[in-house]
UniProtKB/Swiss-Prot annotation:
Interacts with SLX4/BTBD12; subunit of different structure-specific endonucleases. This is Protein SLX4IP. Residues 208-219, 243-255, 374-397 have a biased composition (Polar residues). It comes from Homo sapiens (Human). Belongs to the SLX4IP family. There is a cross-link at K61, K79, K167, K176, K239, K242, K256, K291, K347, K356, K372, K399 (Glycyl lysine isopeptide (Lys-Gly) (interchain with G-Cter in SUMO2)). The modification Phosphothreonine is found at T392. Residues 173-226, 243-313, 365-408 are annotated as: Disordered.
Length: 408
């Protein structure tokens, strides 16, 4: 067994260390224990030596017996990286003194000798491979050998607390760095996807303008662009459709009528102007449907004129179609200034229908209509009309004679 002796300074004491190295194999080779391993052994035993010196000083001040700790029967056992340490303190029977000099005037030799035995661990191939992998992983992640599991038992409680605190700091730093990298990656992905969506929409828009594709294909491309934008920005489809939708062109080619003409039509049909506009045929309707609606409007206007004719005559007899035509012509002849006042038009219409000339025309037309339908009734009506005319003619000369006699 090879042995080495050296001293470790702790305060005002120099602790002598007897280092015994167990050889490897049968040839008693101790070359495996290098100077680097010697420094590592000193670092592992430094705290144990300091605690023993402090205990010695306290026992000497208090004059009490020392605790039997780390004796030959109860040694200290530590594990380093690839070696095993067994250490204990041994009382020395001879008191030694240091040679004092100007630099070490107060230095004293510690009364206990520290005996350390170092032996190499028997590594198997699997254990060596696993340790190499752990070492490689620690080097890649930037972890020092200070956090190695093999040094767990060699550290005192205070060193373990410091190591745990350092481990917690390292974990927090790794968590923050991972979160930052993930957020940056997600942001880059979102920016890339947004740029691709915008470029795709612009390309489809340019293709739609340049090509002479039918409207159905362009609408399909617009819908695809809308869906892509919706999936990226979370916008509803209806809003995008309102933005992208183009207003349809007016293919009817019909111009809106003049306000005066609309008022004429409203007065003839006795309905508001908006109803005439709503009744106009839609450009999408077929010509047959438009003709049917026009016939219905003509029939309704004819019925309205029939009703007003009966009111103006004060009877329920039917009014022929010629009267309706004459009345419609009379209304259309009115100037535009009178058309602006519907009440004035109604008053003039009623006044004209109650005049004597229109009464004679209506009676003559009604008599013709009755002769076609019922000849007997027409004769009676004609006799009554002739009688009234004769009475009027006979009364008129007598009135003139009376006025003439009064004047003379």
């Amino acid at each position: 067994m090879a042995s080495k002796k050296f001293a470790v300074k702790c305060g005002n004491f120099a602790v002598l260390v007897d280092l015994h190295i167990l050889p490897q194999g049968s040839n008693k080779d101790t070359s495996w224990f290098s100077e680097q391993k010697k420094e590592e052994v000193c670092l592992l035993l430094k705290e144990t030596i300091d605690s023993r010196v402090q205990e010695y000083l306290e026992v000497r001040k208090q004059h009490r017996p020392s605790n039997a700790e780390f004796t030959r029967s109860n040694p200290l056992s530590l594990k380093g990286y690839g070696f095993q340490i067994t250490a204990y303190f041994l009382k020395r029977g001879i008191r030694l003194r240091c040679i004092r000099s100007t630099q070490n005037a107060e230095l004293c030799v510690f009364p206990d000798r520290f005996v350390v035995c170092v032996s190499q661990l028997a590594f198997s191939r699997d254990l060596l491979a696993s340790q190499n992998e752990d070492l490689t992983e620690r080097v890649l992640h930037g972890v020092s050998d200070y956090f190695a599991e093999c040094a767990e038992s060699s550290l005192p409680p205070s060193a373990k607390l410091r190591r745990n605190a350092l481990k917690e700091i390292v974990k927090r730093t790794e968590t923050k760095s991972s979160v930052t990298s993930k957020s940056q990656t997600r942001r880059d992905t979102v920016e890339t996807s947004s740029d691709s969506v915008i470029a795709e929409i612009a390309r489809r828009r340019n293709d739609g303008q340049a090509s002479s594709s039918p409207p159905s294909e362009s609408m399909g491309q617009a819908k695809d662009s809308i869906k892509a934008a919706e999936s990226h920005w979370g916008l509803p489809v209806q809003k995008l459709e309102k933005v992208n939708q183009t207003q349809p062109e007016d293919t009817s080619g019909q111009q809106k009528p003049h306000p005066g003409e609309r008022l004429k039509t409203g007065l003839l049909s006795r309905s508001p102007v908006c109803s005439c506009e709503s009744a106009s045929p839609c450009p999408k309707q077929s010509p047959r449907v438009a003709k049917t609606q026009q016939k219905r409007r003509n029939c309704s206007s004819a019925e309205d004129f029939d009703h007003h004719g009966r009111v103006s005559l004060g009877s329920d007899r039917l009014v022929p179609r010629e009267i309706i035509v004459e009345k419609s012509k009379a209304v259309r002849v009115l100037p535009a200034s009178e058309l602006s006042d519907p009440g004035l038009l109604l008053k003039q219409d009623l006044a004209k229908t109650t005049s004597k000339e229109e009464l004679h025309v209506l009676e003559s037309l009604s008599s013709r209509h009755l002769m076609k339908n019922n000849p007997g009734q027409a004769q009676q009506t004609g006799l009554a009309t002739n009688t009234e005319r004769l009475s009027t003619i006979q009364n008129s000369p007598t009135k003139k004679r009376k006025k003439y006699e009064r004047g003379h």
